[in-house]
Amino acid sequence: MKISPALYTLSLTVAAAFVLAFTVGKAYISVPGLWDAAAHQIQQIRLDPLVSFQHYRVWWGPWFNLFGNLALFVPVGYLAYRRSVAATTCFCFLASLTVESLQYLLAAGYSDMDDLIFNTTGGLIGAAAASLHKSPTAMWLFNACAVVILVPYLSLGANQLAAFIA
């Protein structure tokens, strides 16, 4: 089944909003029990790969980082796939590098080699899945899941902003 341009545009917009909300947005929205926004208001580059597994305060922290970053870029790889898994993986690498650079420039999180590796791997997984079968149903599923997660997340951010202003 052919994917309509409107669905494709909607999916790209939702994926971009999702990636930015959970990367740059972490510096502005706290999620109790998962992360504190203040801890991400930092301008730091971490170039040592996989060191994050040694520096977390909770045992599940590195696993949350690993699987969260993989999951974040699977839809990006799926949507970006056209003809080549390798080209799509390179695109995902550049997209991740852009996000990490934005985090550094905006002092909105750690610019981390692990994130670059895990995001690119997530993009590779998404591209590989799309190379096997790309369907409108999968795109609608990505959109629905992203919206279901984004709405409460952004509502939490709006509540924190209102509390800050008051």
Where in the sequence are the language-model features?
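Alpha-helical transmembrane segments that form the membrane-embedded catalytic/substrate-binding core
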Residues: A107-H133
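Bulky hydrophobic segments
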Residues: M1-A107, A128-A166
